[in-house]
Amino acid sequence: MWLTRKRKAEARDELIKILDLTKTLVDRSEESCFDGMSPAEISMDLSIAIDALRAGDSFDSEQLKVHFAPTGILQEVAMMSGWADEYLRISELFDELIAAGA
């Protein structure tokens, strides 16, 4: 059980790093005419999740899954702002961490 908690804590720490990186990229991004949300709104959602994770609280993983989904809002912003390849790497790590119970 201790090991499971340790792994979960490590996964949460990695998820925080991934979300921080994503937030940094989003903060430098341009708005897409195809998105329903601005980069500032996406950044706010990421900040809320990061703060919750750091506090050890629950967060809206379903909302983040929608943001990170293929052809979702983050991919659109990434494509419009020149970080599509990095988005693919980030989203793969995000999916792995969420599946691990982060």
Residue ranges and their predicted role:
Residues 1-39, 94-101:
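Short terminal alpha-helical segments
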Residues 23-72:
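Amphipathic alpha-helical interaction modules
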Residues 63-102:
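Amphipathic alpha-helical binding modules
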Residues 3-11, 46, 51-62, 79-90:
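Short, Lys/Arg-enriched charge-dense amphipathic segments
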